[in-house]
Amino acid sequence: MIDDDGYRPNVGIVICNRQGEVLWARRYGQHSWQFPQGGINPGETPEQAMYRELFEEVGLNKKDVRILASTRNWLRYKLPKRLVRWDTKPVCIGQKQRWFLLQLMCNEAEINMQRSSTPEFDGWRWVSYWYPVRQVVSFKRDVYRRVMKEFAATVMPVQEVAPPRVPPAYRRKRG
């Protein structure tokens, strides 16, 4: 589903722990990392799409998280020309995203990136709040900066009580 301007509706998910760190996921078979994200299906609300993507990509359910915030507006990024599929109609030139900030409410051992038959990620780790802005692929950097800036005031008070943690090395897929 591509809008009239060539953007695919999408949701992005920032999951934070009580220390204010965020879940950073490694793309399957690659050396690139990002937040979970995915398309909105016809008839789905952004929130419904977020919960579906949360389960497919991270293996968590609604009961495992709490919504702390969502972006006020759609945020857009354009794909580099080399990534645009010019032979498909309508042509998708980028993504327009609604972002959700979630607090992890369950034990992090519940995270399982192998729930889907085609996993998006094969590892994850907790990183400092602003780390993703510097590390994400360049064409997504402005959106990440805007998302993290919008969510910052909400995340900082969450850092009070520490839940149980898995050792800090990035976690491999389960399955």
UniProtKB/Swiss-Prot annotation:
UniProt keyword Ribonucleoprotein present: no
Q: Which domain of life is it from?
A: Bacteria
Q: Which GO terms describe its molecular function?
A: mRNA 5'-diphosphatase activity
Positions of short motif Nudix box: 38-59
Cite the entry's keywords alphabetically: Hydrolase
Gene Ontology terms describing biological process: mRNA catabolic process
Q: What GO terms fall under cellular component here?
A: cytoplasm
> Which coenzyme or cofactor does it need?
a divalent metal cation
Q: Per the database record, which ranges form the Nudix hydrolase domain?
A: 6-149
Q: What is its EC number?
A: 3.6.1.-
The entry sums up its family as follows: Belongs to the Nudix hydrolase family. RppH subfamily.
Q: What does this protein do?
A: Accelerates the degradation of transcripts by removing pyrophosphate from the 5'-end of triphosphorylated RNA, leading to a more labile monophosphorylated state that can stimulate subsequent ribonuclease cleavage.
**Name used for this protein in its record:** RNA pyrophosphohydrolase
Q: Say which species the protein is native to.
A: Yersinia pestis
